[in-house]
From Swiss-Prot:
The modification N6-acetyllysine is found at K379. Belongs to the cytochrome P450 family. It comes from Rattus norvegicus. Induction: By 3-methylcholanthrene (3MC). CDD domains: CYP2A. This is Cytochrome P450 2A3. It comes from the Eukaryota.
């Protein structure tokens, strides 16, 4: 009895010493790092966070500590930036210092600092420069890609017509359509909508993307060093990511066998040619691992974000039939019913442009942004962030900044309209991030959102099995990503 009592006292004393050391260490750094709740050893601020509502938890902490604060996600120390001012100061005004890539533990299981999206430094710069130039070579930002989107929109509309107004889940209708646009660039061809391998890839992408938004996904962000060895949903996410990598590797091998260095067919060919050109460069970033993982970055990002935004958009328009009716009216007035929408039409369609921007703002696809890392000791406001400090630029807090949007939690296209009903830009519209590492697929995504939505709405009215007032537009999951509720709907020909 005495021995067990002494053991208990010793354990409590040991834990107390650890906590005191943690507090001392935190206070020692308080003159440098932003303030924040005191972390416990290893678990950090886990007890102050709700992994089911990580974004909301962090925003609640910001109410106490201000727009720039420090949080410990398990053993991982992160500086969090909230609101348009703080995020712009970091990502634009001090763009170079904040250009490093932080952790995204689920994706890091596969990428490990390779590929254009999750790399840093010279590797990121070279791969980004090459990717932007190559996408342009294959028509992105030009008439060529617009025609490809219009063609794919035609296939999608035909698929919706075949449903004859029955209730359907639009998830894979949208993802296979959006994915085919980026597929034609990176693989040189589109997939048939019923291709089983294609549908399997889309499920893998959706599964791993949704995992990052779950409570387990957020827990994994804190304790990946332990959880990667344990059974659980994270193992399924790894399996899905591995399946995607295997598919890309197979595609690359097919291209290698039939490569003509004088006539690149797609992004993979262009990268393979660059690899041949830089074969004797010992510092080259153009090798197989970066090819496979950069291609996967483009394929994944070019599929999930736009298709999920459209899926959220359909739900919001069914919730607000008055807004849907105004978009229909503008489409009929500007485009009519006898030709496809063109990207230049948006200049004469301020209301539709405002609706699309408001869908993106409300959907808030990546609310905590892709984590950054400071590339050197960085003075930020009155703080000093040591080199390597991770940073969360909370894009959701910018998209919902009350200084820029009068009712940030409401869906209202007037957020992007002036008093005369003309479209107005906002400095707080940052769904593609800002600064040196903004999403370089932004131009393609904007074109896809406009052309897909207008061409679909030119042909169909949206019908929910629920009355508008009963439709819940609250996200199903919010973590790294925002996932809209599952729903069914009918596409009724106009």
């Amino acid at each position: 009895m005495l021995a067990s009592g002494l053991l208990l006292v010793a354990s409590v004393a040991f834990l107390s010493v650890l906590v005191l050391m943690s507090v001392w260490k935190q206070r020692k750094l308080s003159g440098k790092l932003p303030p924040g709740p005191t972390p416990l050893p290893f678990i950090g601020n886990y007890l102050q966070l709700n992994t089911e509502k990580m974004y909301s938890s962090l925003m609640k902490i910001s109410q106490r500590y201000g727009p720039v604060f420090t949080i410990h996600l398990g053993p991982r120390r992160v500086v969090v930036l909230c609101g348009q001012e703080a995020v712009k100061e970091a990502l634009v005004d001090q763009a170079e210092e904040f250009s490093g890539r932080g952790e995204q533990a689920t994706f890091d299981w596969l990428f490990k600092g390779y590929g254009v999206a999750f790399s840093s430094g010279e590797r990121a710069k070279q791969l980004r420069r090459f990717s932007i130039a190559t996408l342009r070579d294959f028509g992105v930002g030009k008439r060529g890609i617009e025609e490809r989107i219009q063609e794919e929109a035609g296939f999608l509309i035909e698929s919706f017509r075949k449903t004859n107004g029955a209730l359907i889940d639009p998830t894979f209708y949208l993802s296979r359509t959006v994915s085919n646009v980026i597929s034609s660039i990176v693989f040189g061809d589109r997939f048939d909508y019923e291709d089983k391998e294609f549908l399997s890839l889309l499920r893998m992408m959706l599964g791993s993307f949704q995992f990052t938004a779950t409570s387990t996904g957020q827990l994994y962000e804190m304790f990946s060093s332990v959880m990667k060895h344990l059974p659980g949903p994270q193992q399924q996410a790894f399996k899905e990511l591995q399946g995607l990598e295997d598919f890309i590797t197979k595609k690359v091998e097919q291209n290698q066998r039939t490569l003509d260095p004088n006539s690149p067919r797609d992004f993979i060919d262009s990268f393979l040619i660059r690899m041949l050109e830089e074969k004797k460069n010992p510092n080259t970033e153009f090798y197989m691992k970066n090819l496979v993982l950069t291609t996967l970055n483009l394929f994944f990002a070019g599929t999930e974000t736009v298709s999920t935004t459209l899926r959220y958009g359909f739900l919001l328009l069914m919730k607000h039939p008055d807004i849907e009716a105004k978009v229909h009216e503008e489409i009929d007035r500007v485009i009519g019913r006898n030709r496809q929408a063109k990207y230049e039409d948006r200049m004469k369609m301020p209301y539709t442009e405002a609706v699309i921007h408001e869908i993106q703002r409300f959907a808030d696809m990546i609310p905590m942004g892709l984590a950054r890392r400071v590339t050197k000791d960085t003075k930020f406001r009155e703080f000093l962030l040591p080199k390597g400090t991770e940073v969360f630029p909370m894009l959701g807090s910018v998209l919902k900044d009350p200084k820029f949007f009068s009712n940030p939690n409401d869906f209202n296209p007037k957020h992007f309209l002036d008093d005369k009903g003309q479209f107005k830009k906002s400095d707080a519209f940052v769904p593609f991030s800002i600064g040196k590492r903004y999403c370089f697929g932004e131009g393609l995504a904007r074109m896809e959102l406009f052309l897909f939505l207008t061409n679909i709405m030119q042909n169909f009215c949206f019908k929910s099995p629920q009355a508008p007032q009963d439709i819940d537009v609250s996200p199903r999951l919010v973590g790294f990503a925002t996932i809209p509720p599952n729903y069914t709907m009918s596409f009724l020909s106009r």
